[in-house]
From Swiss-Prot:
GO biological process: negative regulation of DNA-templated transcription; negative regulation of siderophore biosynthetic process; positive regulation of DNA-templated transcription
Classification via InterPro entries: FUR, Fur_C, WH-like_DNA-bd_sf, WH_DNA-bd_sf
Location (main, coarse): cytoplasm
SUBUNIT field: Homodimer.
Organism of derivation: Vibrio cholerae serotype O1 (strain ATCC 39541 / Classical Ogawa 395 / O395)
Ranges for region DNA-binding: 1-84
Region annotation (Dimerization) ranges: 85-143
Annotated protein name in UniProt: Ferric uptake regulation protein
Gene designation: fur
Length: 150
């Protein structure tokens, strides 16, 4: 049995072709932080005949089962990523919509200190930073605009 079949069964979901295909697409590195509409278009490009309503339904089931995490970034559109990843925070460009994942030990430690200061046992957290492209908004045409500076 494949890992994806087992993952669906472990989540209490029946193994169906649409669920397997959607899970396969979500596992592609370039398909993190993907909307339902973008996922649907990707499936069409792969010649998969899965309707948009099915994509929405499966993503909601995956979210409920903990297979994916739903994010509501600025702009109101939900995007999804697999939940199996390590903890990370997000930096979102408001000009082009690029979502950059990052981890920073100093930020993580500071969040723990703040929680302790207010006598709160931190069980979970998420950090979203929003900003505009520092290179005059031309990031829409520049694929390297958001690469880390050295």
């Amino acid at each position: 049995m494949s890992d994806n079949n087992q993952a669906l069964k472990d989540a209490g979901l029946k193994v169906t072709l649409p669920r397997l295909k959607i899970l396969e697409v979500l596992q592609q590195p370039e398909c993190q932080h993907i909307s339902a509409e973008e996922l649907y278009k990707k499936l069409i490009d792969l010649s998969e005949e899965i309707g948009l309503a099915t994509v929405y339904r499966v993503l909601n089931q995956f979210d409920d089962a903990g297979i994916v995490t739903r994010h509501h970034f600025e702009g109101g559109k939900s995007v999804f990523e697999l939940s199996t990843q390590h903890h990370h925070d997000h930096l979102v460009c408001l000009d082009c919509g690029e979502v950059i994942e990052f981890s920073d030990d100093v930020i993580e430690q500071r969040q723990k200190e703040i929680a302790a200061k207010y006598n709160v046992q931190l069980t979970n957290h998420s950090l979203y930073l929003y900003g505009k492209c520092g290179s005059d908004g031309s990031c829409k045409d520049n694929p390297n605009a958001h690469k880390p500076k050295k």
